[in-house]
Regions:
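Signature for HUH/AEP ssDNA processing cores
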Residues: 2-177, 183-195, 199
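Intrinsic-disorder-associated interaction segments
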Residues: 14-18, 72, 146-149, 197, ...
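Modules that initiate DNA replication and primer synthesis
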Residues: 184-189, 237, 278-338
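Generic detector of well-ordered alpha-helical segments enriched in charged/polar residues
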Residues: 22, 26, 80, 154, ...
């Protein structure tokens, strides 16, 4: 039998067939969400792109691995090129302003992704089978056949929708799995919103990394990752594949598991203190905004002016600060926050 990475084949056997990488990323970044392809110097404010990174085995003059950055626009041109790469390629489900993949440049989160490594597998020796599969392999060091039962992966499925939310996709990355929760609407990454997302992601990570799912369930072993973490791109080589260059067997694969999710659905699985703030990207087009808010459109879009701010003299600020410091009383009508 021909198989890719073990978890990919196990998901196939569970009737979760592999999805083409382009289809997967179109689900993550719906048509029209990313900026259209433009020439190098034709940047426009208010248009955002995804950013992919590829780490090569080739070393630069400083003896460090060469890293290439690719802007992913709405036509997915560079993504098509990356899928033919033999490098370690990763990307986060986030759109960015500009070319630098930093948290300050992050604009919208399209999916929450949780990585789980070292999934629990039960192994037992068996007599020589008629043929090897992803569940039966030959152990050269012990000179015997081993049957593998992927109990960690199956435990996840038994508890999706019960103890933790059901993901939209699972990417079999080789050594583990990536759970993608694709949002029905993208979430703007304002700093206060991003903070609640980080808290939620950390909590969900702890919930998923339990002893029934992974061998690395101890607190010191759990991999808590940033909201902005990039993940191996489906269709590209796994960690083993980077050595074997076997694109048929050793590549990451995406498998459709469930529907897109809402913040409300995700929040229903955690206590109040871990919940995300409910805010979504506006559905208004620029044309609609022009009709509804003509003055704003003229000032911000046509003239390119900055957001309006209220400025006051420093002595007025100091006067109010002194009043608050000296006069504020709990329960008083002027009890306030500045």
């Amino acid at each position: 039998d021909i198989y890719m990475n073990y978890y990919s084949y196990e998901l196939e056997s569970m009737h979760y067939e592999e999805v083409d990488p382009m289809t997967f990323y179109r689900d993550v970044f719906p048509d029209g969400e990313l900026a259209p392809h433009r020439e190098k110097d034709d940047y426009k404010t208010g248009e955002y792109s995804a950013i992919a990174m590829c780490v090569s085995n080739n070393l630069n003059p400083n003896e460090k691995h060469q890293i290439k950055r690719y802007t992913i626009t709405d036509d997915f041109d560079n993504l098509d090129y990356i899928l033919n790469s033999e490098d370690f390629c990763f990307m986060s489900p986030i759109s960015y302003a500009g070319k630098n993949r930093t948290s300050n440049n992050a604009r919208y989160l399209y999916a929450l992704c949780i990585e789980i490594d070292n999934l629990k597998v039960n192994n037992k020796r068996i007599f020589k089978p008629e043929h090897e599969t992803h569940r039966i392999t030959y152990n050269k060091s012990e000179k015997c056949y081993i049957e593998h039962e992927y109990v960690g992966l199956h435990s996840l499925f038994e508890n999706f929708g019960v103890y933790y939310p059901k993901p939209t996709y699972i990417v079999a990355s080789g050594n583990g799995v990536h759970l993608y929760y694709i949002f029905e609407k993208a979430i703007p990454l304002y700093k206060n919103i991003a903070k609640t997302l980080e808290i939620y992601k950390r909590r969900l990570t702890k919930m998923l990394w339990n002893k029934k799912v992974t061998m690395s369930y101890k607190e010191s072993d759990i991999q808590y990752e940033s909201l902005y973490q990039g993940f191996r791109i489906p269709g590209t080589l796994t960690k083993v594949g980077l050595k074997t260059k076997n694109k048929r067997d050793d590549r990451a694969t995406a498998h459709k598991i469930g529907d897109k999710v809402s913040i409300e659905y995700m929040n229903s699985f955690v206590a109040e203190k871990y919940k995300m703030s409910v805010i979504y990207k506006s559905n208004l087009t620029k044309a609609q905004a022009k009709d509804l808010y003509p003055e704003w459109y003229q000032r911000r879009v046509v003239e390119g002016k900055e957001k309006k701010r209220w400025y006051c003299k420093e002595n007025l600020y100091t006067w109010w600060l002194n009043r608050i410091t000296e006069e504020t009383q709990v329960g008083h009508r002027y009890y306030c926050l500045m």
